[in-house]
From Swiss-Prot:
PANTHER family: ATP-BINDING CASSETTE TRANSPORTER. It is a multi-pass membrane protein. Disruption phenotype: Does not lead to growth defects or changes in developmental patterns and does not affect sensitivity to itraconazole, amphotericin B, voriconazole, posaconazole, ravuconazole, or echinocandins. This is ABC multidrug transporter A-1. GO terms for cellular component: membrane. The lineage of its organism: Eukaryota, Fungi, Dikarya, Ascomycota, Pezizomycotina. Keywords: ATP-binding, Glycoprotein, Membrane, Nucleotide-binding, Repeat, Transmembrane, Transmembrane helix, Transport. Glycans are attached at N2, N10, N228, N287, N311, N1350, N1365, N1391. One of its GO terms (molecular function) is ATP binding. ATP binds at G838, V839, S840, G841, A842, G843, K844, T845. It comes from Aspergillus fumigatus (strain ATCC MYA-4609 / CBS 101355 / FGSC A1100 / Af293) (Neosartorya fumigata).
């Protein structure tokens, strides 16, 4: 900015005068606009005018002025408000250290002990992050915050915006938001916002819908211009998209790192646009230009400048690699050095402040880079003679600033500002009035939200519908799966007879129906965790309450739940011949539906009460087990142990089951189908001397009363039918309230400040810094200039030339073909550093993907040759590709990641030790020695951005690429010093003969000059220039000027100038078709000639070499797809996966908790169950309930596997590091030892409490049968883990695989012989009984558990009747000899008490189980395990392994 503008800024201390001046200028601009906008409003603009956001002539400044004028002219519109901030004595600290130790299964308890010590009063180490910051940013001003990573820039911005999680603001710090202080964090939360560096959006929502939602959420109560809220939000969306050049992405999904959507730069602009639509008067932007090209970075700053000038918005922005044009838009600058303030003041004076101190600014270095260089002793240049006079350490710089007259003047301004805007004064009242006028009438005055709660819910409902339309797969698969399950259950219990023979089957049917309806929404937990970060971001922006989104999702799910209740329950009810009465049917459907809603609230509240998925899974599994076991069927109420009976009282499912049982049995008499005694010799016995073989039967009656049956068997009372419905409703509302409240107040787990994490036993090397800060996690790294040539000695020298001609790439969007790359030509030679540049979305990353053969979709055409020969299948592993996203295994160390790449990607003939030594050289070369043994971690707890980028490049260098190195945005997100260090590294590699093709955004003039050649693309993937850059970019500049471009100013950055020339920068236009200009140029002709020469010469040389040298075995091996043989791949991958699991204690201990707690719960719920008839039934259900863990076990494995697979498919597979077979087998095998350990724990915690060992005592087989039971539990866990891999192998989402897995799991449970014995199954389903693995599992476990012992009936299980004559023994002798059973007293002459079962083997026979089949069952379980492994591999190969593409065709 010029000095007159700066002076105007600094003199404007009166906010009211400033606002009046802004309004006066707005009126003047509107009246005298040079654009044809007279008589137009922004909402009724002529098509193609400057106010039309969908037209080519749209002008953002003209639109803003017109919008402001319209707002001023509307008396009902809310008053405009602005917000500045003054801060002094600002100190921020955290607790901890700059390093930590990695938690593993073995040492996590040590961490627990340290936390316990802290809880009992042991003080933590205090770490200062920001120290004594002072500054003043008035309304309408822009502040740029400069400093390297780790200097405290992010912490400062978060503090100003009120986001202080993970650190503490000192209580003596003074922050004055123009007369407002404590209210900013709550009442005015959305008025000061922080926009993080990462982009978090719903990936399958379109860009247009994402931004419409944000605009609508901040729509004011009264809208000037006479349009409704929908039109206003739509117009604001179109305007903001036009401002940031993303109008063309309106109907494209946003995507993320794993779901293809808009480009990375476009996604960043979506994040910026979303934040702008919040209309916050104070905006904090944290490195928001990361991933943007320089033109869009400048346009971003220009837009902020426009908002500040016209609307009075205040912006605080941290920038890395800030172009000079972007820096010039700012009024003030804050320079931070390890948390100390070393300058705060006008941007125009900052450079001079350090120059007069004795430092030198190199030629063509931007002001921002010069200021940032002050924080690095390796970068700052001292004037000769000033070596002993300039400050060196952060404290010396801070002390020099404290003593400066500039600081004294700043403190005077802060004092005046605080006096003018006293806290809680009149400006606070004005601010409240303006905010209130904007809010909906139904909104609370103290609420930070604009819309009323009802409006928020409606808006979230709209978004929910858009998301459902975008991805209905989970809903459809759930509905389909539930309908199939209903059909299967109905067919199993098809047309039940209305007599006593179906009593158990009716109970089992209703039990399964209740569980199916109640537990079918368990996967909702996964969805809630996936979207939590997005919703919390929107809450910080004050767009809506998190509970409003939660409430809308409840409503959004209602149509599905209603449809599911109708389709599933109609099929189930009528096919099974449940009570054929209208009232009974509708009560059944109604009860099932409200149970579904209640349990949906249960799952949602569980998810909202916990902060991560791993926290909740084990406990939710035990709760689900409790809900299922204490429903009243598996363990009838009378058999529940006293200490656990309360579980049934707090279990909503038990109330539903009781009501459905009453609904089915109340006031019905069921004819008796089986009498005792009966058969030969008893045909003439009357009813008085025999009894129905059902509980609560009465001698002399040919039926059993339903009320009596459920009262005796289940202790159910008919009067509870509607009472239970009321209880269920109460639970529904209670759990719903818990869900909504917890959603608003409990946030997800966030990372701490960035710290380095080391494996226990490794120590961080001392770094020679005076102070460490939480944010840095390692401080500044030196440039690679200090590394000598010795580190380069082992770097692979390359000789091959890679060339491409007429490369095109087309994808299908809808029904239309879209061309992403259009006839691109070029080459990469050893020792040449080639830059690939273009506007965001021009296809740079796509071109790298195509050239590196990493695309998995679309149609590729053109010619790509290596030394004149087509690329072979070894091409991918012979090239290095450093991706823009720094994707690494979070649990590995830096050294392990590099060694893994070296061992598997270098030639198999290179000795192992040489590969390890090579990794050591790469570590030295990249200056990673001090953190070589640090854990990679996740952002926030592990390597910082710079360190991750170095590691990404290092992984590719460690592979020793034989052909060339691709780098996608290697300097993205890095500050200028680190970017310069990365270019130092590339320059060293180039000088050693490395061939490099590198995309780059926002290069400074000095950085741009370090490249040799440039491939420049415009939108549509069309070449604008390919050739040398030249000294001071002169060859490039001459080309454009010769073809009609205006001259490049001497002080301009050629990288920014050329974007303006071709009209790629937002707001810039050109009448020249630069693509056609290039195609007609002599430079293009020379490129074509050289490509033909290269093809002929290199092909001839290659063929000659192959003919004269012959083909050695090593040469043949070099053309293999993978460098390492399969067994070497498997070994290395297996070691890494074992390390990863060991270093994931939350995964292992949640698995342990799941198995141990569930086993204990089942075991002690059935503690020492007696061998009565119901006791045997309970023991059988004890096995059955243990098997229900299957669902939770596979749900735990699937998300873990999906994360590993995403990393493999995005990084390791395209690099041909190892094969998919090694990946899949290693992930399956790694579960084996842990499942073995879990089986032992589960066996001990379940087998002995139930008391099954007592059944082996009569035959003296306690140890044998105990071992057999453990083997069956072991195979169950192995089957579960392999089945999980089988399910997830083909699916992208764990939710879809979970739905299918639950469907198959339920089928296994249904057909295992517990709920319906083989004799009761329809003949059609017998094959399912035989193919269900649970058939053999239950049969084996049940026979081992209860065989070969006697049964003792409980008192209510005896059947009582009088003999015809004689004793009971004489009367029942014939019957007992044929059908078994025993009498309590054979000598009794009246009231015979008969027990139908004498031995447990009879009970086993009824469920087709026999102890003699135990080893057959064990063997068959292994058959199923092997089948799962084979099916997982087959499915993965069929669905997810890319097929070899046919030879490319010539593009049209």
């Amino acid at each position: 900015m010029n000095e007159s503008h700066e002076a105007g800024k600094n003199s404007s201390t009166n906010v009211e005068e400033r606002e009046e001046e802004v309004l006066r200028l707005a009126r003047q601009f509107t009246e005298q606009s040079s654009y044809s906008t007279a008589g137009q409003t922004p909402f009724a603009a002529e098509a193609g005018s400057a106010l039309d956001p969908n037209g080519e002539r749209f002008n953002a400044r003209a639109w803003c002025k017109a919008m402001l004028q319209m707002h001023i002219g509307d008396k009902e519109a809310h008053p405009l408000r602005t917000l500045g901030v003054a801060f002094s004595n600002l100190n921020v600290h955290g607790f901890g250290s700059d390093t930590d130790y990695q938690k593993s299964v073995g040492n996590v308890w040590l961490k627990t002990l340290s936390l316990a010590r802290i809880a009992f009063g042991q003080k933590q180490r205090k770490v200062d992050i920001l120290q004594n910051l002072e500054g003043l940013v008035e309304a309408g001003e822009m502040l740029v915050v400069l400093g390297p990573p780790g200097s405290g820039c992010s912490t400062f911005l978060k503090t100003i915006a009120g986001e202080t999680y993970g650190f503490h603001v000192d209580k003596n710090s003074n922050i004055n938001f123009q007369g407002i202080a404590k209210q900013m964090a709550h009442e005015f939360r959305g008025e000061a916002i922080y926009t993080a560096e990462v982009d978090v959006h719903f990936p399958k929502l379109t860009v247009g819908d994402t931004l419409y939602f944000a605009a609508r959420a901040r729509t004011p109560r009264h809208i000037p211009g006479g349009v409704n809220a929908t039109q206003y939000a739509g117009h604001m969306r179109d305007v903001i998209m036009a401002m940031f050049g993303i109008s063309h992405t309106k109907n494209t999904i946003v995507g993320n790192d794993f779901i293809r959507g808009v480009s990375g730069g476009e996604r960043k602009r979506v994040s910026i646009a979303e934040a702008c639509l919040s209309n916050a008067p104070l905006q904090c932007w944290d490195n928001s230009t990361r991933g943007l090209d320089s033109a869009n970075a400048i346009e971003f700053c220009k837009t902020l400048r426009m908002q500040a000038d016209i609307n009075g918005t205040t912006a605080c922005v941290s920038l890395y690699q800030a172009p000079q044009a972007a820096y010039d838009y700012f009024d003030k600058v804050l320079v931070l050095y390890e948390g100390r303030e070393i300058y705060f003041g006008p941007t125009s004076m900052a450079k001079h402040y350090f120059l007069q101190m004795g430092f030198v600014c190199p030629d063509r270095q931007t002001d921002a880079d010069f200021l940032t260089s002050m924080t690095s002793h390796l970068e700052r240049v001292v004037q000769p003679g000033y070596e002993d006079r300039v400050p060196r350490t952060p404290d010396e710089f801070a002390a020099r600033w404290k003593a400066s007259p500039q600081r004294a003047q700043l403190m005077q301004h802060i004092k005046s500002y605080n006096a003018k805007f006293a806290l809680d004064g009149e400006y606070l009242d004005k601010f409240k009035q303006s905010r209130r006028a904007q809010q909906a009438k139904a909104q609370r005055v103290s609420s930070p939200y604009t819309l009323s709660y009802v409006q928020q819910v409606k808006l979230c409902l709209w978004r929910g519908y858009q998301r459902l339309k975008a991805d209905p797969s989970v809903t459809i698969s759930s509905l389909f799966g539930n309908t199939i399950i209903s059909l299967v259950i109905a067919s199993i219990f098809y047309n039940l007879k209305a007599d006593t023979s179906t009593f158990f089957q009716r109970g089992a049917l209703l039990f399964f129906a209740v569980l199916m309806n109640a537990l079918g929404c368990g996967l909702e937990m996964l969805t809630l965790y996936a979207q939590r970060g997005i919703i919390e971001k929107h809450s910080r922006y004050a767009l809506y309450h998190p509970s409003a989104e939660a409430f809308s999702s409840m409503i959004m799910d209602l149509p599905y739940k209603i449809l599911n209740a109708i389709t599933s329950n109609i099929v189930l009810y009528f096919m099974t011949n449940l009570r054929r009465e209208p009232g009974a049917f509708f009560f059944f459907v109604f009860t099932s539906f409200i149970l579904t809603l209640t349990m949906s609230m249960f799952f949602r509240s569980m998810a909202s009460l916990s902060r991560s998925l791993v926290q909740v899974l084990p406990f939710s599994a035990v709760l689900l087990l409790g809900l299922s076991m204490y429903t009243g069927f598996a363990i009838p109420t009378g058999y529940m142990l006293g200490w656990a009976r309360w579980i049934a009282y707090i279990n909503p499912i038990s109330y539903g089951f009781e009501s459905l049982m009453i609904n089915e049995f109340h006031n019905r008499d069921f004819p008796c189908m089986d009498y005792v005694p009966s058969g030969p010799g008893y045909t003439d016995v009357g009813l008085n001397n025999r009894v129905c073989s059902t509980v609560r039967s009465v001698p002399g009656q040919a039926f059993v009363n339903g009320n009596a049956y459920i009262e005796s068997a289940y202790s159910y009372t008919a009067s509870h039918k509607w009472r239970n419905i009321g209880v269920i409703f109460a639970y529904m509302f209670l759990l719903g309230a818990v869900y909504l409240v917890a959603t608003d107040f409990i946030t997800e787990k966030k990372p701490k400040g960035e710290i380095l994490v080391f494996p226990r036993g490794h120590k961080a090397l001392k770094k020679g810094k005076s102070d460490e800060d939480l944010e840095g996690g390692g401080g500044r790294s030196a440039t690679v200039e200090k590394i000598g040539s010795d580190g380069l000695a082992m770097i692979e020298r390359q000789t091959a030339i890679f060339q491409w001609k007429d490369v095109c790439f087309d994808i299908k969007i809808g029904k239309e073909n879209c061309r992403i790359l259009d006839h691109v030509d070029g080459w990469v030679k050893p020792g040449i550093l080639t830059a690939l540049m273009g506007v965001s979305g021009a296809g740079k990353t796509t071109l790298l993907d195509v050239l590196a053969t990493r695309t998995t979709m679309g149609i590729i055409s053109g010619e790509m040759l290596v030394d004149g020969q087509p690329r072979d299948e070894s091409f991918q592993r012979k090239t290095g590709y450093a991706q823009q996203q720094d994707l690494h295994l979070s649990t590995a160390t830096v050294r392990e990641a590099l060694e893994f790449s070296a061992l598997l990607r270098q030639s198999a003939h290179v000795p192992r030790q040489e590969k390890i030594d090579y990794v050591t050289e790469v570590i030295k070369l990249l200056d990673m020695t001090e953190y070589a043994d640090a854990v990679i971690g996740v952002p926030g707890e592990g390597l910082n951005v710079e360190q991750r980028k170095r590691l990404t490049i290092g992984v590719e260098l460690a592979a020793r690429p034989q052909l060339l190195l691709f780098l996608d945005e290697p300097t993205s997100g890095l500050d200028s010093q680190t970017s310069w260090a990365i270019l130092d590294l590339l320059d060293k590699l180039k000088k050693n003969g490395q061939a490099i093709l590198c995309t780059i955004h926002q290069p400074s003039a000095m950085l741009f000059q370090r490249f040799d050649r440039l491939l420049f693309l415009q939108a549509g993937g069309r070449t604008v220039y390919f050739g040398e850059i030249g000294q001071n970019s002169q060859i490039l500049i001459d080309y454009f000027v010769r073809n009609g471009a205006p001259p490049c100013p001497p002080d301009a950055n050629p990288a920014e100038w050329m974007l303006d020339v071709i009209g790629a920068a937002p707001g810039s236009h050109t009448s020249i078709n630069w693509f056609e200009t290039w195609r007609r140029s002599p430079e293009y002709a020379r490129v074509q000639e050289h490509l033909a020469e290269l093809k002929h010469e290199r092909r001839h040389q290659t063929n000659l070499f192959r003919t004269t040298s012959g083909q050695k075995r090593e040469d043949k091996d070099s053309y293999r797809e993978f460098a390492a043989p399969f067994w070497a791949q498997l070994y290395q991958v297996q070691v890494r996966v074992f390390q990863q699991i060991w270093r994931s204690p939350t995964y292992i201990y949640s698995k342990t908790a799941l198995c141990v707690l569930s086993a204990l719960f089942v075991g002690f719920s059935l503690f020492h169950t007696p061998n009565t008839i119901q006791g045997l039934q309970n023991q059988m259900f004890g096995i059955f309930m243990l098997l229900t863990l299957f669902g939770q076990l596979i749900q735990q494995i699937m998300p873990h596997f999906v994360a590993q697979r995403a990393l493999y498919e995005v990084r390791d597979r395209p690099a041909k590091t190892y094969s998919w077979k090694a990946f899949l087998i290693a992930n399956i095998v790694v579960e084996l030892p842990w499942n073995s350990l879990m089986s032992v724990l589960m066996f001990l915690c379940w087998y002995y409490p139930i008391g099954l060992y007592r059944n082996a005592e009569p035959t003296d087989a306690v140890h044998l049968r105990g071992t057999q039971m453990w083997l069956m539990i072991w195979t169950f866990l192995l089957f579960s883990s392999t089945f999980a891999h089988f399910m997830i192998a083909a699916f992208d989402a764990a939710e879809n695989a979970g739905n299918l897995g639950n469907l198959l799991f339920l089928l296994c449970l249904l057909f295992c012989g517990v709920l319906a014995t083989p004799d009761q199954l329809p003949r059609f389903w017998i094959f399912m009984y035989r193919v269900s693995p649970f058939t053999y599992l239950v049969s084996g476990m049940l026979s081992v558990g209860i065989s070969n012992t006697n049964v003792t009936c409980a008192d209510n299980e005896y059947l009582r009747f009088d003999p015809v004559n004689g004793t009971c023994g004489e009367y029942m002798g014939s019957y007992m000899s044929n059908l078994g059973g025993y009498l309590a007293d054979e000598m009794a002459t009246a009231n015979c008490s008969f027990c139908p079962i004498k031995e447990t083997n009879v009970f086993l026979g009824r469920v087709s189980s026999s102890y003699s089949d135990i080893w057959r069952n064990f063997g068959l379980m292994w058959v199923f395990i092997v089948f799962n492994i084979f099916a997982a591999c087959s499915l993965y190969w069929w669905v997810r392994v890319p097929r070899d593409k046919k030879p490319v065709a010539k593009a049209e």
